[in-house]
Amino acid sequence: MKRIFTTLLALVAFVAMVTAQTVVESKRPSNKAFQKAVATIMYKTNGHDITAKRMKAMEVTQSELNHFPHTEWRAYRNIKDTDALAEAELSSVPYFMRQALDKIKKEVETTKVKDGTVAIWLLYNMGYIIKTPTSVFGIDIHTRYVEEVADLVDFTMVTHAHGDHTNKPFLKAMSARGKQVFAAFDIEGVNSTKIEHEAVYTVGDITIRTTIGDHNKKLRNFVTSYEIDCGPRTDNTVLFHTGDSNNYLQLNPEKKVDIFMLHMSVGLNIQAAINNIQPRHVFLSHLQELGHRIDKWRWTFHDALKLKDKLNHNHIWIPCWGERIIYKRSNWK
């Protein structure tokens, strides 16, 4: 009886400890702590070297993200009044998003991209903005800041027709400015370049090779992968953005890939894809998609860190919103 009682006490203590840990992990940070973490992520650390400082900032930021449901995200996206919008962006996730965009806008304008390099920013989800010595372009831009981003980029690409990868108001704004939009599907009100499977396009000195693959078993030939040669002034740096592609056998770039931008949890055998493609760097993407429920399809920094530890590759990145990455191939072995 004494042994049973002791066991019960131990069990109660364990449950209490787990409960306490859960409460601590879900505790919402103060606005000051959150803003400090955002600054640390965007200005003081990088997604390749997960230092203790970076880890702490990711933990604080994640705690706030965990308190921002998809319903609040939708409400924020629908704010029309400028005063109400400014008020919303003083704190929480809208603050992070506004700070990220302001940083990107300033840095895209002021960053002098040297020959042999490419500047890359993660805007949101799988939406990247890339600046070369000759051009600025976007991939899978999904934002409430339609006009501001449309002014920022020269052309853009869309991997597929899902709402977390495309944004019709943004694409219409691009089209209205006479800027090129690449997509494999028709978009009402957008004068787009209708891309094909196994095709090659050029924009200035940038070469884009497209292939089309599966999203899942039901959505066959649904996602466009973009193999982007950023041009001779970048030493022909190659980006390979595969959107929500989930079949690694369909991911077959022709050139040596510098940066492989992939969905971290779409059913893709990532290690097999890495083994097949042999990229120099891997960007784990599709984290913190706020349109998804917190408990469904919203992958966290913790999820990405666990995946990073499992993968056999020396250069796995976990980029965050607003982070600038200056890539120069010769700086890496």
Language-model regions, residue ranges each:
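Active-site environment of divalent metal-dependent phosphoester hydrolases
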Residues: Y145-E147, H162-T166, E188-V190, Y201, ...
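Binuclear metal-ion centers of metallo-dependent hydrolases, dominated by the metallo-beta-lactamase
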Residues: Q21-P29, K194-G204, R220, P232, ...
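Active-site-proximal loop/helix segments of hydrolase catalytic cores
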Residues: H142-Y145, D214-Q278
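Short internal beta-strands
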Residues: M157-A161, G178-I187, F283-Q288
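Metallo-beta-lactamase
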Residues: A20-L122, I129-E148, V153-F155, T166, ...
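Bacterial Sec-dependent N-terminal signal peptides
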Residues: M1-Q21
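Active-site regions of enzymes building and remodeling cell-envelope glycoconjugates
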Residues: V153-M157, K179, G189-I208, D258, ...
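Divalent metal-coordination and catalytic microenvironments
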Residues: I130, H160, I208, D244, ...
